[in-house]
Amino acid sequence: MSETSCSFLIEKEFQDGQVESVSAGLSPSYKDNGALMAFRGIPISELKNHGILQVLTAETNGWQPGVVSAEMLRAQEEWEVVDTIHPDIESGVSSQQPGQFISFNEALEHFQTVDLSSFKKRIQPTIQRTGLAALRHCLFGPPKLHQGLQEERDLVLTIAQCGLDSQNPTHGRVLQTIYKKLTGSKFDCALHGDHWEDLGFQGANPATDLRGTGFLALLHLLYLVMDSKTLLMAQEILRLSHHHIQQFPFCLMSVNITRIAIQALREECLSRECNRRRKVIPVVNSFYAATFLHLARMWRTQHNTILDSGFVLKELGIEPRALRSIGKRSTAELNPQPAPAFLVWDYSRAFMHGSR
């Protein structure tokens, strides 16, 4: 191939808008360089096989850079951006670098430090009773919550008014931790996607299933998976939820149990134990975990199916104080294999006092 024909082919490519003319960017010293002239007809993919790259980098004496066009600068900037592109959470693409787990206390601290005043206005701390119901509750009902614990109770109810914000890093870490702990995955996942349906949400966006419970439902799931004892319990219940006959939506069931816990708190069923322990959040968490375990035990032993879910939840929610007897359950009730001693909980002491 002659030099003229080669130059014609190169300039034709440039006219198509791909690159500029090479001849316009070469210095006279390069045009006179015999070694380079010999390789003009070699495809770019073959340069590495002929030592061209070494020639271009080693023979720099007398070389003066030509004028760089605006198109060349723009192409260079676009190329440099390639290595700095990061996945967008909303696009559903997950990062290959897994994020750190977030503990329950760290997530709770987030809500203790942000301004929740707009959400707090919506809460109703206790059930408003009138007439005979108010009199009966006053005479025979549980004690009132100590005044020093009312702020902590209000925080729990306020968190239940907060929705899931996928743009909030803390909210995202909570979701990622729940997913990875339940599935055993080592990598983060998209915050929206069909994989959430596998865990028992109704759709691809977990936020749509949190009505009536808000972010408290996710905090309860986080509490369940971040403790070594309750994590094993959660994984057993998750396996039960995937049973070919007794299957049920795991996360959606958890949300409903959070709703029962909120109702128990507002009805002051947990006040006695909260007063005794001088804490509210740990008592609510224990009540949630014990109720979930009780539901799973009922589900397995009574051979319930998804058609029974409404009845089972109604039975649990009719009188939360009846759950005082669910203590001392273990995953042995979910698994025929003997459960380790550390998997046995004593929730009964907490709730037997709550109904007296």
Swiss-Prot record:
GO terms for cellular component: cilium; cytoskeleton; Golgi apparatus; kinocilium; stereocilium. Expressed in the cochlea and in the organ of Corti, as well as in the supporting cells, including pillar and Dieters' cells (at protein level). It comes from the Eukaryota. GO terms for biological process: auditory receptor cell development; cilium assembly; cytoskeleton organization; gene expression; protein localization; protein transport; sensory perception of sound; stereocilium maintenance. Residues 170-324 form the ELMO domain. Its main location: other. InterPro entries: ELMO_dom, ELMO_domain-containing. It is found in: Cell projection, Stereocilium; Cell projection, Kinocilium; Cytoplasm, Cytoskeleton. Transmembrane segments: none annotated. It holds the Pfam family ELMO_CED12. Keywords: Cell projection, Cilium, Cytoplasm, Cytoskeleton, GTPase activation. Acts as a GTPase-activating protein (GAP) for ARL2 with low specific activity. This is ELMO domain-containing protein 3. It comes from Rattus norvegicus (Rat). The gene is Elmod3.
